[in-house]
């Protein structure tokens, strides 16, 4: 019996000036992938654009929250700043991952919608491979991890209500 094909994902892609070349390379690499239905580029588009990473990360994460895209790929120098920023949007789970196992578990264990790379940390060929693998994973709402992800969401709601 053949496996059910995975539905294609709507992606956002974002970077600061430290991630422009990887963003462009990854966007080109993913644009022909059948698991991608669309890519929304929220910038930046040039190394001369000094828009700080929090702005583009929040913009891309908000697209997920608003249901306009399914996931986002973000690149900065380390991948850490964009992840921290994206995680400020309620309901968003962003991770920085530079290896196969972490990319897999980001989806299967944590239902992370955002994958972040550091252009100064990871080679472009590995980034392309990991981004391609990332597209093949889907979170199982019936998995043992679902309760843990729900606990994260519950805590988030609790703290949002308090503040």
From Swiss-Prot:
Q: Does the keyword Calcium apply?
A: no
Does the keyword Magnesium feature in the UniProt annotation?
A: no
Which GO terms are recorded in the biological process aspect for this UniProt protein? carbohydrate metabolic process
Enzyme class label: isomerase
| GO molecular function terms noted in the UniProt entry | isomerase activity
Active site annotated at which positions?
76 (proton acceptor)
Q: What is its EC number?
A: 5.3.1.-
Q: Which InterPro entries does the record associate with it?
A: Rib-5-P_Isoase_Actino (IPR011860), RpiB_LacA_LacB (IPR003500), RpiB_LacA_LacB_sf (IPR036569), SPI_LacAB/RpiB (IPR051812)
Q: Which domain of life is it from?
A: Eukaryota
List positions binding D-ribulose 5-phosphate: 16-17, 77-81, 110, 120, 148
User: Which keywords label this protein?
Assistant: Isomerase
TM helices/strands, residue ranges: none
Q: How does the record describe its quaternary structure?
A: Homodimer or homotetramer.
Spell out the protein name for this chain.
Answer: Putative ribose 5-phosphate isomerase
